[in-house]
């Protein structure tokens, strides 16, 4: 496995690739499993939830998403996993149905690290895609991180950046500056 360079929205050459309409993946593809492994390693190293192939310079219809595991603290102070991480590989995904109703979400992107803005997303979507074995799937998600991540990653495959979805650019902000501006607790 290898960590790949993530292309940036604010780099002119990278942006050309990020704005491309991606070509479909022809399955089977014996190199795809290694690419997917590299994508997961890259996404995890960048602390992301999703990554599309064009974000690492490969303009094909492939994206990955991993919903983080959930944990609970027990009465004795120990922590236990209550929901495992959910990894998804979506090949040639297409959103085939959507709610028609939007919700505003605070959203960021690994191609513009540290920046977030309010993005309108459908309250539910149905997506059709293939897995690594070429099997076709249909998945509906409503009002959760996976549903919003699907919309974000499919946008990447269509050359649409999250910054283009923001209706009020005053909501676009650099959270690293916000984080750096917070006072440091100096208690002993």
Curated annotation (Swiss-Prot):
Signal peptide: none annotated. Its cofactor is Fe(2+). The keyword Metal-binding applies. GO terms for molecular function: metal ion binding; peptide deformylase activity. The keyword Hydrolase applies. SUPFAM superfamilies: Peptide deformylase (SSF56420). Its EC number is 3.5.1.88. It is an enzyme of class 3 (hydrolase). Keywords: Hydrolase, Iron, Metal-binding, Protein biosynthesis. The active site is at residue 153. Binds 1 Fe(2+) ion. One of its GO terms (biological process) is translation. Fe cation binds at residues 109, 152, 156. It catalyses: N-terminal N-formyl-L-methionyl-[peptide] + H2O = N-terminal L-methionyl-[peptide] + formate. Transmembrane segments: none annotated. Disulfide bonds: none annotated. Belongs to the polypeptide deformylase family. Removes the formyl group from the N-terminal Met of newly synthesized proteins. Requires at least a dipeptide for an efficient rate of reaction. N-terminal L-methionine is a prerequisite for activity but the enzyme has broad specificity at other positions. NCBIfam families: pept_deformyl, PRK00150.1-3. This is Peptide deformylase. It comes from Chloroflexus aurantiacus (strain ATCC 29366 / DSM 635 / J-10-fl).
């Amino acid at each position: 496995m290898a960590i790949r360079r993530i292309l940036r929205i604010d780099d002119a050459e990278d942006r050309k690739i990020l704005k491309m309409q991606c070509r479909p993946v022809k399955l089977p593809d014996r190199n795809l499993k290694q690419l997917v492994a590299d994508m997961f390693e890259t996404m995890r190293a960048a602390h992301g939830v999703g990554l599309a192939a064009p974000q690492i310079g490969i303009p094909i219809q492939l994206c990955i998403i991993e919903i983080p595991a959930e944990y609970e603290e027990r009465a004795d102070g120990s922590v236990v996993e209550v929901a495992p991480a959910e990894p998804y590989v979506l090949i040639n995904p297409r959103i085939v149905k959507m709610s028609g109703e939007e919700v505003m979400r605070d959203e960021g992107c690994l191609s513009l690290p540290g920046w977030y803005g309010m993005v309108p997303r459908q309250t539910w979507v149905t997506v059709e895609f293939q897995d690594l074995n070429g099997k076709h799937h249909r998945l509906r998600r409503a009002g959760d991180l996976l549903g919003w991540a699907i919309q974000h990653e499919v946008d990447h495959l269509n050359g649409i950046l999250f910054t283009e979805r923001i209706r009020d650019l005053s909501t676009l902000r650099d959270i690293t500056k916000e984080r750096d501006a917070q006072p440091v607790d100096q208690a002993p």
